[in-house]
C-alpha cells in the first residue's frame, strides 16, 4: 500500500472532503441527468462524456457550456430544473459511498477536524448530506462554490474552507474524485488523495500528490500506521 498518505497525515490538521462521489453516491446520477437535459436542447452527450467534461466543475461552468452548445435557448430556470431532477433522483435512493461512516468515526476518535468543500450549491450539498444522515456531522463545516468567485480547478474554494476553519493549507488533506478537484488542491498548496471508489478512473487522478485509493477506509489504515 502507498505509504505517502501515512506520512502526510501525521501533520494533517483538517481533512477536506469533496461531496459528490466521495461522501455521497451521486456521481452515477448527475451525469445521466446532464446528458439527458443537454440532449434535449440539442447537444447530444453521453454520461461518460459528461463525466469527462464536468466532473468536479461548478454548476455555473456546466450551465455556460450547455448554453454555448445548445441549439435552442436555455430558459432561466434550466439550472434549477437540473438541481430538482438530481435531488429527486437521489432522494429515491440516497447512499453514502462505502466506508464514509467508518472513516468519519475514525477521524472523530482521533479528534481530527473535517469539512466538505464541493462544487455543488449549498442547497444541493445540504440536501445530499441530510438524505444520507450526515448533515449533523458537518454542521458549520459546509463550503460551496457559491461562496467564492472561482470554482474548481481554481484553489479559491479550498483556501476559503481552510481559512474559515483556521488551518494552514499545508496542513490540510483533500480527498477528491475529480481531476479538477485535485488540480484545485495542488493550486492551493494542499496535499491531495485521489478517490477512485466511484465511477472515476484511477488514471485521471494520478497527479494527486498522495496517490489514489479505491476505498476510503484505506485512509484509516494509513493514518494508523
Where are these regions (language model features)?
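Asp-based, Mg2+/Mn2+-dependent phosphohydrolase catalytic module
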Residues: 1-13, 105, 121-225
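N-terminal helical cap/lid subdomain that shapes the substrate entry/recognition surface
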Residues: 3-110
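Conserved phosphate-coupling serine/threonine residues in phosphotransfer and NTP-handling enzymes
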Residues: 22, 118-120
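Short beta-strand scaffold positions
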Residues: 25, 116, 175-176
Amino acid at each position: 500500500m502507498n505509504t505517502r498518505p501515512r506520512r502526510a497525515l501525521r501533520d494533517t490538521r483538517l481533512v477536506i472532503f469533496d461531496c459528490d462521489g466521495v461522501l455521497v453516491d451521486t456521481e452515477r446520477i448527475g451525469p445521466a441527468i446532464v446528458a439527458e437535459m443537454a440532449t434535449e436542447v440539442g447537444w447530444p452527450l453521453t454520461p461518460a462524456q459528461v463525466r469527462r467534461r464536468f466532473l468536479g466543475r461548478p454548476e455555473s461552468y456546466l450551465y455556460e457550456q450547455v448554453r454555448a452548445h445548445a441549439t435552442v435557448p436555455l430558459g432561466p430556470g434550466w439550472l434549477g430544473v437540473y438541481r430538482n431532477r438530481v435531488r429527486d433522483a437521489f432522494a429515491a435512493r440516497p447512499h453514502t459511498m462505502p466506508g464514509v461512516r467508518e472513516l468519519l468515526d475514525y477521524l472523530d476518535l482521533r479528534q481530527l477536524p473535517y469539512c466538505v468543500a464541493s462544487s455543488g450549491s449549498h442547497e444541493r450539498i445540504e440536501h445530499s448530506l441530510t438524505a444520507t444522515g450526515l448533515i449533523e456531522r458537518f454542521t458549520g463545516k459546509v463550503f460551496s462554490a457559491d461562496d467564492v468567485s472561482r470554482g474548481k480547478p481554481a484553489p479559491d474554494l479550498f483556501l476559503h474552507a481552510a481559512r474559515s476553519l483556521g488551518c494552514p493549507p499545508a496542513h490540510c488533506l483533500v480527498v477528491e474524485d475529480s481531476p479538477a478537484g485535485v488540480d484545485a488542491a495542488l493550486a492551493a498548496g494542499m496535499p491531495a488523495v485521489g478517490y477512485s471508489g466511484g465511477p472515476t478512473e484511477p488514471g485521471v487522478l494520478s497527479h494527486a500528490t498522495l496517490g489514489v485509493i479505491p476505498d476510503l477506509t484505506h485512509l484509516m489504515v494509513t493514518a494508523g500506521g
